[in-house]
Curated annotation (Swiss-Prot):
GO terms for biological process: DNA recombination; DNA repair. Belongs to the RecR family. The keyword DNA repair applies. This is Recombination protein RecR. Keywords: DNA damage, DNA recombination, DNA repair, Metal-binding, Zinc, Zinc-finger. SMART domains: TOPRIM. A zinc finger (C4-type) spans 58-73.
Amino acid sequence: MTRFAEPMARLIEELRKLPGIGTRSAQRLAFHILRSSTADAEALAGAVRDLKAQLRLCSVCNNITDVDPCVFCSSPTRNQRLVCVVEEPTNIAAVEKTRGYNGVYHVLHGTLSPLHGVGPEHLRTVNLLARVERGEVDELILATSPTVEGEATANYLADLLRPLRVRLTRIATGVPAGSDIEYVDEVTMTRALEGRREL
């Protein structure tokens, strides 16, 4: 095993903790940082420090933000009564890319996953329930992933929210645009057929 000087070994070990970064990638990144200018290395360290010091969760929707409420919840041009419920803050970017959604969001910060010890108490639903109970929401779009965990989470939320008499909708799933039907799996094809619409 290659031995590195303590500062290099420590940086490699910290980089390995990032998702998708193995030992070799961590070593490449560490050597890249070492070869960078001092200003670039300090800018990177400062950005990481600022990330932890300045970002927090929006008190309304749980999105990651540097202002509270976040830019979506405080926007006068957004439909505040239409709420898209997503698993993670990164899902917001996917919805925003469509440029077809003008509502606001609620971030759960996870999905139900009993095998990984994630139960309903781990999802951030308290302020979502409060918004619905106060009559501030007309429709909730459940935009969890079409995975076992995402479906379980959507079903749990539907059961939890249905008694509050709010309109609940689920994002459609089906055949991806540009794909060949021959290669679509059975579950996707079933959902596409069930979610068909009039022309």
